[in-house]
Amino acid sequence: MSELSKALRERAEDSILQLRGAVAEFKNVCYANSLGSESSVLTDLIWGAVPQIEIFSIDTGRLYPETYELMERVQQRYGRTLSIYYPKTEDLEGWVGEHGINGFRNSLEQRRGCCGVRKVEPFRRAISGRSAWVTGIRRGQSASRATASPVEWDAEYGLHKVSPLLEWSENEIWEYIRKKRLPYNSLHDSGFPSIGCAPCTRAVQPGEGERSGRWWWERGDSRECGLHPRRQMGFSK
């Protein structure tokens, strides 16, 4: 990491220590790669220094083409394979048959139901049997994430949640990506600081929050897909 500034190198080394600590303390640690900018950093840290951590992604079936392209570039860069989880066909067919392909726009309940089928259920399968999962959340992303702790008990899923990038700023994320010339989602160059499913993510305007382009038709700052529900944490370290 000689190409990094001293401050950023120390930041990265601290995150690696957190990842190694998670591997030492918990069994079968995994990382949920969302294929955003934070994922570029964490994938590099994990596959470069803590390869025991399995990295997986969820293909909801409605991702941007640029996101699928990134999957390929990441695997080519590191010579490793991402584990990909998909929605269950019968669940997806049932939900679309009842609500329509874009039924998530009808109400908050239906949007959460769509996220549940396309993302949360595959995620539950991915973490089954695990004792900890790694996330790329940062305090600066939203008010609901600002109070998170580096290691928390995730009562929703019954395992620990480790967030080694919690203290990183957006500028630090991008400095790391550029200095190490990491593959990243090209949508970031078009005003997308946060990227999810294509129908539910748009570019943000100057001065808007990092996650304001996610489910923009909904009100409130705590718009989440369900992987990081609020008030789910029992205790923290």
Residue locations for each model-derived region?
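Nucleotide-activated chemistry modules centered on ATP-dependent adenylation/adenylyltransferase
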Residues: M1-K237
